[in-house]
Amino acid sequence: MRLILLGAPGAGKGTQAKFIMEAYGVPQISTGDMLRAAVKAGSPLGLKVKDIMTSGGLVSDDIIIDLVKERIAEPDCQKGFLFDGFPRTIPQAEALVAAGVNIDHVLEIFVEDEEIVSRLSGRRVHEASGRVYHVKHNAPKTEGVDDETGEPLVQRDDDKEETVRKRLAVYHEQTEPLVDFYKKLSAESSDSLPVYSRVDGIGSLDDIQARVFEALKK
C-alpha cells in the first residue's frame, strides 16, 4: 500500500495514520523526518541539506524528491509507505510522478473548517504533565485548572483561533489543488491509480477508522 494522506491540520490524520501503519505494516514518511535523518546520517545529500538549512534557505523540491527516492528504497518500505504532509504542492506532486514514484491511494480526511477551529481552539494543556483538556468535550472539573494539581491550564499559541485559521488558509491554498491533481491523474491513468477517496472525519475514532479502511479496500 503506497498511500498519500491528506487533511487539514486538526482533521485527525495523525491518529488514523497510526492505525494504517499497524494494519498494513508500512512506515509513515514525512519530509521533516526525512530531512532530519539525512542530516544525521551525513550522506552527500544530507550534507547539502544541512548547508541549506544552516544558511536559512528552503530545501528545493528536487532535493526533497531525491530524499523521497532514497527513503522508499529502504527495506522497511517493501510493503509500501504512507506519505504524511507530502506532497504539499502541485510542483511536488508533478515531480513525484516524473520520478516514477507510484501511488496506490490518495486518502483525504475531510472536516469542515469551523469544526477544526472548535477542536483546536478549545484545547487547554497542563504544561508540566502534558495532560490535554477541551473546553467542550473534555473539560476540567474546575474551569482553567488541572484536575490533579490545581495548576493553571494554558492555550498553546498553535491552538489560538487566529493561528488555526491562518494554518487552514495555507492548507486550502497549497494542498486543496492536489485533490484535483490526483483525481485527474487517476482518470487519465490506464490502471486508474491512484484511487482518490474522501472520508468524513467527524464521529468516534472507531467510526472514522472503519470509514478509512473501507475506503482503502477500493
UniProtKB/Swiss-Prot annotation:
Residues 30-59 are annotated as: NMP. Transmembrane segments: none annotated. The keyword Lyase does not apply. GO terms for biological process: AMP salvage. It is found in: Cytoplasm. It catalyses: AMP + ATP = 2 ADP. Residues 122-159 are annotated as: LID. Keywords: ATP-binding, Cytoplasm, Kinase, Nucleotide biosynthesis, Nucleotide-binding, Transferase. Gene3D superfamilies: P-loop containing nucleotide triphosphate hydrolases. ATP binds at residues 10-15, 123, 132-133, 203. GO terms for cellular component: cytoplasm. Its EC number is 2.7.4.3. Pathway: Purine metabolism; AMP biosynthesis via salvage pathway; AMP from ADP: step 1/1. Its main location: cytoplasm. GO terms for molecular function: adenylate kinase activity; ATP binding. AMP binds at residues 31, 36, 57-59, 85-88, 92, 156, 167. Consists of three domains, a large central CORE domain and two small peripheral domains, NMPbind and LID, which undergo movements during catalysis. The LID domain closes over the site of phosphoryl transfer upon ATP binding. Assembling and dissambling the active center during each catalytic cycle provides an effective means to prevent ATP hydrolysis. Catalyzes the reversible transfer of the terminal phosphate group between ATP and AMP. Plays an important role in cellular energy homeostasis and in adenine nucleotide metabolism. Belongs to the adenylate kinase family. PANTHER family: NUCLEOTIDE KINASE. Monomer. This is Adenylate kinase. It comes from Saccharophagus degradans (strain 2-40 / ATCC 43961 / DSM 17024). The gene is adk.
